[in-house]
Amino acid sequence: MMYKRMTILSVVFMLMFSTLYLRLFVIVQNEEYVSAGKKQGTYTINAGHTNGNIYDRNMNSLVNREYEYYAVINPTPEAAEEILPFIRDKDEYYGSLVYGKPFLCSVTSGKFKSEDITAFKVPVRYGKNSIAHHITGYTANGEGVCGIEYAYNDFLRSAESVNSVTYTVNGYGTALDGIKKDVYNGGEMKSGVVLTIDRYIQAICELAGRNIKKGAITVMDIYSGDILAMASFPDYDLENLDKAVLDEDSPLINRCLYSYGVGSIFKLVTAQAAFEQGLNEDFSYCCTGSVEVDGQIFKCHDLGGHGEQNMTEAMANSCNTYFIELSKHIDNQFFIDTAKRMGFGMSIPLASGMTASGGNLQTLEDLELPAEKANMSFGQGKLLAAPLQVCAFTCAIANEGNYCVPRLVKGITDDKITVSGGEPEKITRVMDRETAFRLQDLMIAAVDKNPDSNARPSNNHAAGKTSTTQTARFDEDGTEICHGWITGFFPLSSPKYAVTVLCEDGGYGNDCAAPVFKEIIERMTNINY
């Protein structure tokens, strides 16, 4: 009996095993099950990434400053209900929801109760309130196109922080219940390029220049050559670059690096050369409003003439004919060499793809023509320079004769603490201290001691020189279109900063550029710079 029962059980087990084997064989041979089996495993969703930062001198980021939220959702009924009020694009959300698989969506909040929702706070490369566009540049298709984004493209793109969520899924891509998801948060991006720019001074300049239709503002540290701000106008909208390309005002040009006629600012170089050739402030000349040079008539802006004046008075009055006369006593080669020492005619490389134009400086052959030398004496004719060049030579005057090569990049950082690989400061003496002090006095007379100057700040003291540069272009009323300039330094008690403002096609320097210069100094003084 026992044997018979064992035989029956054995037969039953064999039948059950055979049935199971046949069932497994059918499953294995079924293409749908084979395909589903191959898909089983893990499924990772990336939820935003961050590339290397671009920092100012104080490690304040100029990019990645604003944030948006992304959520990865495993679409259970409870999770789908909780996240719905915070969805930015509901059409896209519903389109993904129908598949029942985990997916990524843009949301307005980063806080959710459901375990099936994982939210991330992701930096926006360029937010609505971003600044310094002409310095940072922009990207397209994940690559830097211009500015620092282009110059340091490989480094910035190699530094990447990525957020992700990984699920264990079945053959149809649906998250398996009871198996914990893996969440990876890329964390704060610390690697980046460190600039000499001061974010707050840059913001002040962009605010002060809000009414400049076309132009540029540059601020430098006179002791190091560090560029603290470089604002170009008009700015452009990073979300609408096609419009910027077609804009007749060319907003994509960085006008701080572009060359223009300099005008009366160059009278400081003429004065410097005169000092170094033995002339002094007592050199006098009677301005009658115009003067003839080699058959060409040169007019002063005061057609009635300034009368008898010395160099200090001529600088304050910006008398063209005085400096034409002064230049006659300067050796031609020495005149050119003096301008070169002050950076005129020399380009200024800042980073790959970012170089201030060398402009144009008259040659020795040019100055053999008396009329061309007359033009150069007050910054007209063939003479061209970029606002950054003008700011750099202003630094040399304020820094007692030491010329600092402008610098934009301090280096790179991997930890937001240490900086390496930057260009060192380059400082050269270009005039003696006495000459620098005498030029400072001329600039003080032109602004701080000039009641007609619109550049005098109400809460500080500054020195400077304005320019109104002729362009030989005229408006519909026949009035000549001019560029307005001012360059100067402050505070007088202990000079620290040089400021240069250009208003392209803006008119008289004292009318368009000087008030901007004044506002910048007042705002910087208010925040104790």
Residue ranges: model-predicted function:
Residues 1-31:
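Hydrophobic alpha-helical transmembrane signal-anchor segments
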Residues 30-44, 64-67, 72-81, 177-189, ...:
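Short pre-catalytic segments that frame enzyme active sites
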Residues 44-67:
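Short extracytoplasmic
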Residues 48, 55-56, 156-163, 167-169, ...:
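Hydrophobic alpha-helical segments, especially N-terminal targeting/anchoring helices
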Residues 49-51, 214-217, 458:
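Short loop/turn microsegments at loop-to-beta-strand junctions
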Residues 61-63, 222-264, 269-505, 509, ...:
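Beta-lactam-recognizing serine transpeptidase/beta-lactamase-like catalytic domain environment
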Residues 65, 85-190, 501:
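Small/polar-residue-rich segments within soluble enzyme cores
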